[in-house]
Structures are given as structure tokens and as C-alpha cells.
Amino acid sequence: MAFGNEAFPIVLLCSLWYAISSSNNVIGKKILLDFPYPVTVAMVHLLSTALYLSPTLHVWNIPRMHSIPKSTFVKLILPLSFGKAFSSIASHVSIWKVPVSYAHTVKATMPVFTVILSRFVLGESQTKEVYCSLIPVVGGVMVATATEVSFDMIGLLSALMATFTFAIQNIYTKKAMRDLRLNHLRLLQLMAIVGSAMLLPFWALCDLRRIIIVIQSGEQEMLWLLVILTINGFLNFAQNIVAFTVLSIVTPLSYSVAASMKRILVITVSVVLLRNPVGVVNVLGMLVAIFGVFLYNKAKYEANRRKHELPIVTKHPPMENNIKNNHIHYHLV
């Protein structure tokens, strides 16, 4: 009975996570098909994150942020915020140009970029199992790309750029939380605020005039568009919060399984509802890539577990553990 009581909230949260993520991706694609302004959609997502996190952090009683030195802000926060804005734009361009199913398959290459960047930026080497897990990831994405009916080079490059930027953010977010001793949600809020401010002039230059022309022409039902953009922004925020909550009550390995299942469901729902054409080999490539991501997460989990079993004494283990957990949260979402 106790097991049932513990399992019920996990199943409920995972179901909610899957439903929100699938809905958000389908709605996002629909918006970009009718309203092809990915910079505007990215701006809405950043503003929504900044806006909705304020009451959330207050309710959860997350400690307030202390003052950040100007040099640290310039060297760390500004690049991270720029990366968040850029990756959001690139991600939405990819969703606009290619099917959701294919964009999500390309984003499965995140472990490849993470391993390469960790090696050259941090000097970290991985276990043989981790390197081997990258083979199905790369192979699956290559098969999916070769057989993608609605292939678009801009969409592919945008998805790769978004994934590459996410990988860089994962590495430097760890450094930011270690150096600044910030809660990961406080850092996320700060990045969203600064990223919105950085994106504002580019948005005004790129989209504002064209949107005004569309409004004046009466081509779009603006009230409905504002409503659907607001819903999309809230769903994006809710998706991240639910994902953080799931990881806080399950092991990283269990989370990786849940995340892999979520990606499969998002791809399936998008194929069914958006009716983008896929072939058997194309689907096989997607599944192989997702399975490779699961193998990567499992290999990393085992490597970290073995590392923690070694008799290493550190001066501040609680803080280091906290930072590590925060990094895992950010990386997996």
C-alpha cells in the first residue's frame, strides 16, 4: 500500500508532464504555421518564464538572490542569457521549418555535443560505455535525416544550433551555480529576464514592423493569437516546473527513462495530430536515437555512481552535492 501511495504522485506528475509537453509542441507548431515569427514566440517564452517564476519562487520560499559582482555578471550571466535567447530562437525556427517529430529527433544529439564540449572545455573524459552510447544516437539521427520526407536544411541547422547552445549552457550553468551559489530556479529567472532584455531590440527590428502590418491588414485574428501565445508561454513554463518536480522525487536514471518516454510520446502525438508524413525507416531512426539517449543517461549514471563509491574526502560535500544535483536538473530539462 505504501508503494502505491508513493507511486501515485509520480505517475500523476509524469502523465501531466507528457500531456503538457505534447500539447505545447503541437500548439507551438500550429502557431508558427499561422504566425511565422519564431523570434516573437521565443520572446513570449522568455517573458513567460520570468513572469511566472516570480510568484512560484515566492510560494516555494526559495531564498532571494544576493548581489552579483559586475565582472561576474558580464563574464557569466550575460553569455548564459544570450545563449538562452539564441537557443530559444533557433529551437522555434527548427519547429517552424521541419516537423516536430524530426526536430525532437535531432535534439537527441545533445549528449554528443555535451561529451565533446566537456572534453575540450573542462578536460573531462568519459567511460567507454558513454562513448559507445553515442553510436546509436548519431546513427539514428542520420537515418532519420536521410529518410525525412519534409527535410529542410535551415530546420536541421537550427535544431543543431539550438542543441549545441543547450549543451554549452549546461556546462556553464554548473559553473554559475558553483561560483554564485544560486538556486537553479533563481538562475533560470535571472537568465530569462536578462535574455528578454537582450532579445527586445532584435525582436523590434526583426518582427515588430511586420506584425504591425499584419495587424493593420486584418489578416490575423489578433485576440485569438494573443490568447494562444499566452497559453503556449504558460505551457512552456509549466513543462519545466513539472519536469523539475519529477526529478526531485525520482532517481536520475528513472528520470531519463521518463524523459525518453516523453520524447517518444511527443513525436507520436505530433505525427498523429499534425499528420506529417513518416516512413517505417524514418520512425526506426527516431527510436534508435532516443534509445541511444537512454543508454547515454544510464552509462553516465553508472559512471557517477562508481565515482561516488570511491573513498574521496572533500572539504564541502553538501555544497558540491547540491551543485551537482542542480546541474543534473538543468541538463535533463
Which role fits each region the language model picked out?
Residues M1-V333:
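Polytopic endomembrane small-metabolite transporters, centered on the Drug/Metabolite Transporter
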